[in-house]
Amino acid sequence: MKQKKSVKEEDKTPVVLVVDDNQENLELLQAYLEDVDCETVAAHDGLEALRIIERRAPDLILLDVMMPKMSGFEVCKKVKNDPQTSDVPIIMVTALNEFGDIERGIDSGTDDFISKPVNKLELLTRVKTMLKLKHLTDKLERTLAYLSEIEKQTQMAKSD
C-alpha cells in the first residue's frame, strides 16, 4: 500500500525505472539520465520491471516495447490497471513508430512515446517534464488530503 507523504514533507530524489532488454540501450538511457537529478533503476525485461515496481513504485518509467517474457504494451497495461501505480507516468522508448503501434501504446495506457534512436535532448526534455508533472500531481494530492483533514476537524469542532 502506498504511503502518503505529508504536505510539508521534503521532496525526495525522483526514481526513474529504465526497462530495456538490450544492455547497450539500457546503458545509453542511464547515461543520458545522468543529466537529470534522479535515481535510475534498471530492468532487463517486463517481468523484472513488474517485480521492481511492486517493491517500490518509481516516479517515471522508460519502457521498451519489444522485450522477451512480456512486451512493454503488457507491462504498461498492468501498471496502469493497478490502482497503486496507475498514476506513474510511462514513456515508451521504441523502434516501433507505425500508426498502429502508437495506437496500441495509447490503448495500453502510455503517457508518451520516444522513437529510437533516442535523441538526448528530446529524452531529457520529456523526462524532466514528466517528473515535474508527477511532482506537482503528488503535491496537489497531499495538499487536498491535508485540506480534507482540516475540514473534518473543523466540522467536528463545530459540532462539539
Please provide the spans of the model-predicted regions:
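Two-component/phosphorelay signaling modules centered on CheY-like receiver
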Residues: 8, 15, 23-41, 51, ...
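Active-site beta3 strand of CheY-like receiver
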Residues: 56-62
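C-terminal output helix
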Residues: 118-127, 131, 135
